[in-house]
Amino acid sequence: METRYQRHIQLDEVGTTGQEKIKKAKVLVIGAGGLGCPALQYLTAAGVGLLGIMDPDMVSISNLQRQILYNEDDLGNNKALCAKEHLRKLNAEIELKAFPWALTHDNAAEHIAEFDLVLDGTDNFYTRYLISDQCILLNKVMVYGALYKFEGQVSVFNYRNGPSYRCLFPSPPQAGTIPNCSEIGVLGVVSGIIGVYQALETLKVILELDTALSGKLLCVNVLNHQNSILDFVKNQKEIDQIKKQGKTIPIENEDCFVDFELSLEQLSSNEKIMWIDVR
């Protein structure tokens, strides 16, 4: 008789031991939008034992173009609560926790401490740097993703004492210098591709695989399939600064939104980054 996770268990890299690791894992997904929705669906299906879902926003009609976990009946309702309801129907064996409010300086440590790993599905610098700094302080892995039109980025931070988000992006750009998807748009399926990549990297971390994107930034361009991997190194000074303060470094503008950190041209000017063409 087939079991729910039989296809996982048949893999040498997973097996019964790996599936047990997945069952015991605790993952917090912050942002149940374009990135969070596909990631949540696959992590739920994979059998992650505890999934936290945090998002203060309500489902709107413009979300349905890419946030396919929701439907028209969810319009006007909180995303975290709707996601929990839909995911429960996908896998009743796992525990789901909904947090229908925003991550803040006041609650970040408490929420992140409860989980092994944080999947960043946010769209603003304020929350992203808050997640990053708390993950450094609490020694938690952060799985990152971002979107821009037909492009996306994925990386894994703080894995096995590896580089952090601030090693790649030490400080946010000035407000208004980088637009968000509500201003420039994003192809819906790109959200799905990058969100699934985040779910994949999350499972790699849970399974303790050596191939996780630690110290590597995957840049995906679905329009022309010119994909690249950028190698970057750990900046201990940035990490030590966070640990010395013992708290997150505030972002001056809490409304500074972003869906894509830097263009490939901007990244290529960084001398600490090495490009690898993966076409």
Describe each PLM feature range.
Residues I53-L90:
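Glycine-rich phosphate-binding loop and adjoining beta1-alpha1-beta2 segment
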Residues A45-L50:
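Conserved S-adenosyl-L-methionine
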Residues I30-G31, M54:
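Conserved N-terminal Rossmann-fold NAD(P)-binding element of oxidoreductases
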Residues N221-R279:
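Flexible, polar/low-complexity N-terminal or interdomain linker segments that lie immediately upstream
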Residues L35-G36:
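Hydrophobic/small residue at the entry helix of a nucleotide-binding pocket
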Residues N91, E95-F99, L103-T104, E114-I194:
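E1/E1-like adenylate-forming module used to activate ubiquitin-like modifiers
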Residues M1-L28, T248-C256:
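N-terminal charged helix/coil linker that caps or initiates catalytic domains
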Residues I22, H111-D116, S268-N270:
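A short, aliphatic-rich alpha-helical micro-motif
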